[in-house]
UniProtKB/Swiss-Prot annotation:
<feature type="domain" description="ATP-cone">
    <location>
        <begin position="46"/>
        <end position="136"/>
    </location>
</feature>
<comment type="similarity">
    <text>Belongs to the NrdR family.</text>
</comment>
<dbReference type="InterPro" id="IPR055173">
    <property type="entry name" value="NrdR-like_N"/>
</dbReference>
<keyword id="KW-0479">Metal-binding</keyword>
<keyword id="KW-0862">Zinc</keyword>
<dbReference type="Pfam" id="PF22811">
    <property type="entry name" value="Zn_ribbon_NrdR"/>
</dbReference>
<keyword id="KW-0804">Transcription</keyword>
<keyword id="KW-0863">Zinc-finger</keyword>
<dbReference type="GO" id="GO:0008270">
    <property type="term" value="F:zinc ion binding"/>
</dbReference>
<dbReference type="Pfam" id="PF03477">
    <property type="entry name" value="ATP-cone"/>
</dbReference>
<dbReference type="GO" id="GO:0003677">
    <property type="term" value="F:DNA binding"/>
</dbReference>
<keyword id="KW-0678">Repressor</keyword>
<protein>
    <recommendedName>
        <fullName>Transcriptional repressor NrdR</fullName>
    </recommendedName>
</protein>
<comment type="function">
    <text>Negatively regulates transcription of bacterial ribonucleotide reductase nrd genes and operons by binding to NrdR-boxes.</text>
</comment>
<keyword id="KW-0805">Transcription regulation</keyword>
<dbReference type="InterPro" id="IPR003796">
    <property type="entry name" value="RNR_NrdR-like"/>
</dbReference>
<dbReference type="InterPro" id="IPR005144">
    <property type="entry name" value="ATP-cone_dom"/>
</dbReference>
Length: 156
């Protein structure tokens, strides 16, 4: 790590802390030449493999933007969308892989979105699962109701 003050190539770590829900490390460093102190943030890169074969860095903002469309006209706050995006990132990072398929991100969005707003969930699922008719919506609603009943029985 080069010192931002004197460009010397050696520094020592004084302090390290996990930040951003474990997805990054903040390190306080001291230059061994000029004793200047500076902070670095180290983050493991998570790449998204898109359907066309292109890879790009994971973006929470893209998750928020996609889910915001499904939530249009619904009473869902920006903070809720940001928390959902963080939850999705934590889910896909927990796979332990540095690369995740775009399809897996969509899958990771479904459950937290359903908990947040069922109408937004149906809108998102209709695109993600390529609904073609009202029957597809009806099947999904029946599935949601069954899962809701099962959850109530478990909490019982």
């Amino acid at each position: 790590m080069y010192c931002p003050f004197c460009q010397h190539g050696h520094s020592r770590v004084i302090d390290s802390r996990v930040i951003e829900a474990g997805s990054a490390i903040r390190r306080r460093r001291e230059c061994s030449q000029c004793q200047g102190r500076f902070t670095t943030i180290e983050k493991a890169v998570l790449l998204v493999l898109k359907r066309n074969g292109v890879t790009e860095p994971f973006s929470r903002e893209k998750v928020v933007t996609g889910v915001r469309r499904a939530c249009q006209g619904r009473d869902v706050s920006d903070d809720s969308l940001k928390r959902l995006a963080q939850q999705v990132e934590e889910t896909v990072r927990s796979s332990g892989s540095s690369q995740v398929r775009a399809n897996d991100i969509g899958l990771a969005i479904l459950d937290p979105l359903r908990e947040l707003d069922e109408v937004a969930y149906l809108r998102f699922a209709s695109v993600y699962k390529s609904f073609e008719s009202a029957d597809d919506f009806e099947k999904e609603i029946r599935l949601m109701r069954r899962q809701s009943r099962e959850k109530q029985v478990q909490q019982g």
